[in-house]
Amino acid sequence: MNLHEYQAKSLFAEYGLPVSEGFACDTAQEAVEAAGRIGGNLWVVKCQVHAGGRGKAGGVKVTGDKEEIRAFAEHWLGKNLVTYQTDEKGQPVAKILVESCTDIANELYLGAVVDRATRRVVFMASTEGGVEIEKVAEETPELIHKAIIDPLTGPQPYQARDLGFKLGLNPTQMKQFTKIFMGLATMFVDHDFALLEINPLVITTEGNLHCLDGKIGIDGNALFRQAKIKAMHDPSQDDAREAHAAMFELNYVALDGNVGCMVNGAGLAMGTMDIVNLHGGKPANFLDVGGGATKERVAEAFKIILSDSNVKAVLVNIFGGIVRCDMIAEGIIGAVKEVGVKVPVVVRLEGTNAELGREVLAKSGLDIIAANSLTDAAEQVVKAAEGK
């Protein structure tokens, strides 16, 4: 689960981090009034979406004219913002953040992730702030400095000072950076973050550190104990198919191929996608129906897969370990009849009662292609998707 910038900054403020005064607004009039409440003669207005690259897409504006703020809000509210991190449809804009303008002398980067390699929370800092950190990591990895947080000792001030020296901070800025680092590290654990970014963390013309932006991703598995964070969820930013799948406890991720995949088990699902790719196909999704692949869940899975107009064929790959393949076959038949599937369906069953399951499919009278192996299934579904 991701948070909007204004939500991230509200958490930053709770932990004593320096952020701009700002208000998230639902209407153009609110945006104009927010500028008046903030005061001054220069403001920044930002579209609130779960995506980076807003500035290049026209979703950020610096202005000293309240009527320009009104025009900006009227233009974007209710529309979709398309950036390099969204699909071609973009993300809907429901709120505009109006903030005081900050005078910038230098831009830095500070972020943290749960690193699978070290199995620790790892902080990253760089002098290359305000740009795509992925490009920095790829082209000049030596400019990214890291601090690994030991879960037994927690974050330590010396780690902040080490990063601060590498960023070239002066003694005053070092103290500020240490406070920011310790606050972020504490916040990361307190709220079960999976990702945290301040890009840019700026040095103002007065020489102070300031959190100019904020990006936070939450571990979805921890939301049961994060009621406050869960209440911040904005469903309008979710993929509609992924949100629908979550209602039925289906793990679904939309992709851009034409072969729909329905599999039980995340590992088998990833392997299925790999073998479809190996045989020249492109998966349209990742979908794990889990161990309890009932008729109802299979039917919903078909509905979700087929809601993607790019899907030209569906591969159902089931290993009968927890469930019997004959029961799965009956569920597939019922789902195909209920949903009215119009594209070719290739089914590969293996495991408990696999042969009986294939017999059930053969006797159904439906146009379902039974595969003898995973390789055969991949070859068949790729051909079907190509209309061969």
Swiss-Prot record:
Annotated cofactor note: Binds 1 Mg(2+) ion per subunit.
Cellular component annotations (GO), alphabetically ordered: cytosol; succinate-CoA ligase complex
Annotated EC: 6.2.1.5
Binding site for substrate: N264, G321, I322, V323
Pathway(s) served: Carbohydrate metabolism; tricarboxylic acid cycle; succinate from succinyl-CoA (ligase route): step 1/1
GO molecular function term, any single one: ATP binding
UniProt keyword Manganese, yes or no: no
Ligand binding (Mg(2+)): N199, D213
Subunit structure: Heterotetramer of two alpha and two beta subunits.
Role of this protein: Succinyl-CoA synthetase functions in the citric acid cycle (TCA), coupling the hydrolysis of succinyl-CoA to the synthesis of either ATP or GTP and thus represents the only step of substrate-level phosphorylation in the TCA. The beta subunit provides nucleotide specificity of the enzyme and binds the substrate succinate, while the binding sites for coenzyme A and phosphate are found in the alpha subunit.
Protein's UniProt name: Succinate--CoA ligase [ADP-forming] subunit beta
Organism: Shewanella sp. (strain ANA-3)
